Amino acid sequence: MFDDKGKYLILGLGKSGQGAVIGLSNFEDCQVAVTDRKNLDDIRDAAAILEEHNVPYLNERESVERLSEFDILVKSPGIPMDNNIITKAKELGMPVIDELELGYQILNYRLTKPEERLIAVTGTNGKTTTTNLIGEFFEASGYSIYVAGNVGLPLSQIACEVTDTDFIVLEVSSFQLEFIKGFRPKVSMILNITPDHLDWHGDLDSYIRAKMNIFKNQTSKDFSVVNVDDETTFGLNRESKGRKLNFSKNSLRTEGSFIEDDHLVINYLDTKTSIIHKHDILLPGEHNLENVLAATTATLPFSISEENIRNTLKAFSGVDHRLELVRELNGVKFINDSKGTNVEASLKAINSFDSMILIAGGKDKGADFSEFAEAIKEKGVKKVYLFGETYKKIASALDKVYYPEYYIVNNLETAVTGAYQDAISGDVVLLSPACASWDMYDSFEKRGNHFKSIVYSLGGE
């Protein structure tokens, strides 16, 4: 329950923490302070927001000493539970919630039944594409919809803008879902699950349990959606009280979306309808077919016409940093897949192209790169440029499959220029790191934008 006169300490001044500051600033009786391990001088954007909203900043020592002055600790995603401030809060019996939960509590405080217009998407891969495509479906049908969460603005930031006539589709992560209390979407979906963020969750079972929280508060009035082709997600919605919807690249007898005779077909309310031939879907890549099916399934409980779904699928080409064509230079295509932050995502990227030079590496999240190395060899990737924290692990995996054509470089600039020098007309230079960006960049977006700026700086026609 949201307390509009509460005393909130926000832990973390990244995108989510800043969103929480902006959201809580709409309630004049709320008392808000912020803490972060970083010096405020090093996070100027955040400092400007604090100044604008007259929110004090506490260093780590001050926040621990003054913690008892607050009612609720709002943590940013990804901050581990062994953080000193979280540990102290638990000792004091203080509620610890995530920014996502704060946003939902504000929605519930302001609106009538906000859950009826809320869709949430999680999974290891495909979240951003699926979330954006759902937004496109609703916009094509004339609805007002916010695309938010990990893509767009944090829920807590938009929670005071949303009206009772707006829809919201959220991309949500395992970090956020681990700490929900009342969060309840009308439609909740898990796209797929492969090992990721094991450095944070500890093991795969913990990661899966966090993802499953997306169904935690659903009732019989809600809908739970899973990918029945994914052996890990299949059946995860059994414990959900929501109505079960499925999607598959194979024919289904249950309600949901699937492929039959090369057509996307929906089956809902005892009506089976063919929507579009899969070759007429603009979004490239076999893996994106799953994202299309998931997004289509999310529309079934709402009044989205088949024509609007069809027209959107003919026009939607994808999102930035996910198999994004940056430029074709002297016959060489440069593809930005900086969103490929884990092995499974990059495997799908590799399988989308032929005749490629790959750029990979980044923050070590505890991944096993053996399957990645095998795919590189089997696909016949011409060369691989490795950089970042994981270069040794990936190189070792490549050595074990007797793949010698890799080069270790210090930075992305060297990788891009080297790959371009090696490439010939018809080749693809693919940035798909299979790793997070945090060893060298603040986000995968900044890494992808740096890649694009390097590509645009290359000569040629």
Swiss-Prot record:
Pfam families: Mur_ligase_C, Mur_ligase_M, MurD-like_N
Chain positions recorded as ATP binding sites: 123-129
Catalytic activity: UDP-N-acetyl-alpha-D-muramoyl-L-alanine + D-glutamate + ATP = UDP-N-acetyl-alpha-D-muramoyl-L-alanyl-D-glutamate + ADP + phosphate + H(+)
Keyword Heme: no
Example GO biological process: peptidoglycan biosynthetic process
EC number: 6.3.2.9
Coiled coil: none
Cellular component aspect of the GO annotation: cytoplasm
Keywords: ATP-binding, Cell cycle, Cell division, Cell shape, Cell wall biogenesis/degradation, Cytoplasm, Ligase, Nucleotide-binding, Peptidoglycan synthesis
InterPro entries assigned: Mur-like_cat_sf (IPR036565), Mur_ligase_C (IPR004101), Mur_ligase_C_dom_sf (IPR036615), Mur_ligase_cen (IPR013221), MurD (IPR005762)
A molecular function (GO) term: ATP binding
Pathway as given in its UniProt record: Cell wall biogenesis; peptidoglycan biosynthesis
UniProt-recorded name of the protein: UDP-N-acetylmuramoylalanine--D-glutamate ligase
Organism per entry: Natranaerobius thermophilus (strain ATCC BAA-1301 / DSM 18059 / JW/NM-WN-LF)
